[in-house]
Amino acid sequence: MSQAIDSAAADFELLASLRRGEGGALMALAERYGSMIYRLAFGVTRNQADAEEVLQDVLLTLARKGESFEGRSALGSWIYRVTTNAALNKRRGKRREVEVSIEEHLPTFEADGHRSGDRTYLLADWSQDPERTALAGETRRVLEQGLDALPPHYRAILVLRDVEDLSNEQVAEVIGDSVASVKSRLHRARMALREQLTRHMAQP
């Protein structure tokens, strides 16, 4: 509890420094949140150069708009929101073509792991085989390909939930969507990645 209070106090002081225009405030912001911003930006854009540009854009946005932060949510939540929007906009700027609807290229699965409409296809259950789930170099490559294939909005939810460890409610607040929608998209994104790995593991 005390750590959370200390963190909130540090954020409050950092924000106050930004509003006062103090020279070291932006550097302090970068040191405190830079890694988080880059991690999320890369998770959405899947491109190092784009993620670095998003990082710079977000830091400048925070420096310019620090006065508009009303404190209704944690500073970190606000930064997540700014970063997610910036990363998604970066992707939209690079891909003008209309993306295929997620329903057309992401499979759906039943709770027992079977693909909807196909009882012969069952996702591998790795929970009882920890050695098999270890991400070796080749398997990691397959996972990266699966992430690349996800629409950016789904990647954003996946990174916020599974990498940044936000709750479903926090993710919904960041992206401006309902909790039910977050849960649905998160499930489909996870299942798509799991199917990608299942296919790879099944290869001789």
Q: PLM features: residue spans?
A:
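Short, Lys/Arg-enriched C-terminal cap helix and immediately downstream tail that follows
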Residues: 70-71, 92-95, 150, 155, ...
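Short, charged helix-capping/linker segments at alpha-helix termini
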Residues: 2-5, 19-28, 38-57, 156, ...
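Helix-turn-helix DNA-binding module
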Residues: 141-181
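Structural recognition of an alpha-helix C-terminal capping motif at a helix-to-coil junction
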Residues: 39, 53-60, 73-85
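Sigma70-family region 2
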Residues: 19-20, 46, 57-74, 92-95
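Arg/Lys-rich amphipathic alpha helix in sigma70-family domain 2
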Residues: 67-71, 84-102, 108-113, 136, ...
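N-terminal module of bacterial RNA polymerase sigma factors
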Residues: 1-36, 43, 122-132, 148, ...
